Amino acid sequence: MARIAGVDLPKKKRVEYALTYIYGIGLKSSREILEAVGISFDKRVHELSEDEVSSIAKKIQQSYLVEGDLRKKVQMDIKSLMDLGNYRGIRHRKGLPVRGQTTKNNARTRKGKKKTVGSK
C-alpha cells in the first residue's frame, strides 16, 4: 500500500482517483500531478514502483498545500474573519450560514436542533 502525505492510498484503485483521498487534492490536481511526473492515469496504485511513489510525493510536497497544513490554514482564515468582526466573521461566530442563505425556514444543519419555546 502506497503512503503519500500521511494517507494510505487504496491498492486496487487507479492512481488518479486514489490521489483524491488526500485532503486538498481533487481530480484535476491529481491529473496535473500525474502529467507532471509522467505517470499514466490508467495505472493502479499497486502497480506503482517506489520511485514513482516518491516522485508523486515530492511533487505534492513542493507544489500543494495538503492535509494538516491545509486544514490549519482554513481554520486560521476563519479565525481571522472572526477577529476582524466583519459580516462573514460574525456569521461564523454565531454558527449561521455564511454565504447569504436565508434562515427563516431552513439552515438546520448550521443552526442545530430546533429550540422550542415553552407555552402556557
Curated annotation (Swiss-Prot):
GO terms for molecular function: rRNA binding; structural constituent of ribosome; tRNA binding. Keywords: Ribonucleoprotein, Ribosomal protein, RNA-binding, rRNA-binding, tRNA-binding. PROSITE patterns: RIBOSOMAL_S13_1 (PS00646), RIBOSOMAL_S13_2 (PS50159). It comes from the Bacteria. SUPFAM superfamilies: S13-like H2TH domain. Residues 93-120 are annotated as: Disordered. InterPro entries: Rbsml_uS13_C, Ribosomal_uS13, Ribosomal_uS13-like_H2TH, Ribosomal_uS13_bac-type, Ribosomal_uS13_CS. One of its GO terms (cellular component) is small ribosomal subunit. GO terms for biological process: translation. Residues 107-120 have a biased composition (Basic residues). Belongs to the universal ribosomal protein uS13 family. Part of the 30S ribosomal subunit. Forms a loose heterodimer with protein S19. Forms two bridges to the 50S subunit in the 70S ribosome. PANTHER family: 30S RIBOSOMAL PROTEIN S13/40S RIBOSOMAL PROTEIN S18, SMALL RIBOSOMAL SUBUNIT PROTEIN US13M. Located at the top of the head of the 30S subunit, it contacts several helices of the 16S rRNA. In the 70S ribosome it contacts the 23S rRNA (bridge B1a) and protein L5 of the 50S subunit (bridge B1b), connecting the 2 subunits; these bridges are implicated in subunit movement. Contacts the tRNAs in the A and P-sites. This is Small ribosomal subunit protein uS13. It comes from Helicobacter pylori (strain G27). The gene is rpsM.
